[in-house]
Amino acid sequence: MSNETPQQPTPANELLEALGTTLSPDLLVQALTHRSFSHEHPGVANYERLEFLGDAVLELVSTETLFTIHPDMTEGQLAKMRAKAVSEDALSAIAKTKLKVGPYILLGHGEAEQGGAEKNSILCDIVESLIGATFLEHGIDEARKVIHRLIDDTLAEVATEGPALDWKTSLTVKAHGLGKEEPVYHMEVSGPEYAQIFTARVSLGENGDIIGIGKGSSKRKAQLAAAEAGWKSLDSFKTRTK
């Protein structure tokens, strides 16, 4: 394969309109260039440095926003909300639904054949690299506007989830608040090896009464389901004792 840099496509105006800013063509192309493409075309810069920068800017702005709009939340609650709002799942969904960036990502042949334009990890990286490019070209104020445009509805959504952000942690906190012992998860596995069903029963203390039961295709999913049931059980108990 030739090492000459190919004619690089300029993304459609719709992408920049969705992003809500402008970027120089060279910087925009870099923000969309995966390392597999630059490996096949030496001398073409990829998005990794921009992603590194964008990740830091995104963390700053999302933290600042949550800190401001939720003055009564603890550090732990804010950290959980931020983690979910800027998670790989959340950012890749933004890349797919808001930016529709997949067709514009520059990938090496192998990565393209493996569906790289639809991989959540790459889509997440692209969102961060575009934020980094915005910060580099326009500064923090413009980057802040872009971030709000992209994630404000996600921040609002996670704010309504409350304990659902982490049922196991939420159950532990509620149990401690009621003066109860630490939650203990008792596991059972059934079904053939290729289709195992995990059942978790959660009690407060090793020998306490079972307060929640959950099933799932993995130990983690079963424990989360049990923790949710246990949390709701304790929430009902707390309401009855008021």
From Swiss-Prot:
Q: Where is the DRBM domain?
A: 165-236
Compartment(s): Cytoplasm
* Residues that, per the record, bind Mg(2+): 51, 125, 128
Q: Could you name the active-site residues? A: 55, 128
Q: What does this protein do?
A: Digests double-stranded RNA. Involved in the processing of primary rRNA transcript to yield the immediate precursors to the large and small rRNAs (23S and 16S). Processes some mRNAs, and tRNAs when they are encoded in the rRNA operon. Processes pre-crRNA and tracrRNA of type II CRISPR loci if present in the organism.
The Swiss-Prot or TrEMBL record describes its family as follows:
Belongs to the ribonuclease III family.
- Specify the protein name: Ribonuclease 3
Organism field: Bifidobacterium longum (strain NCC 2705)
State the encoding gene. Answer: rnc
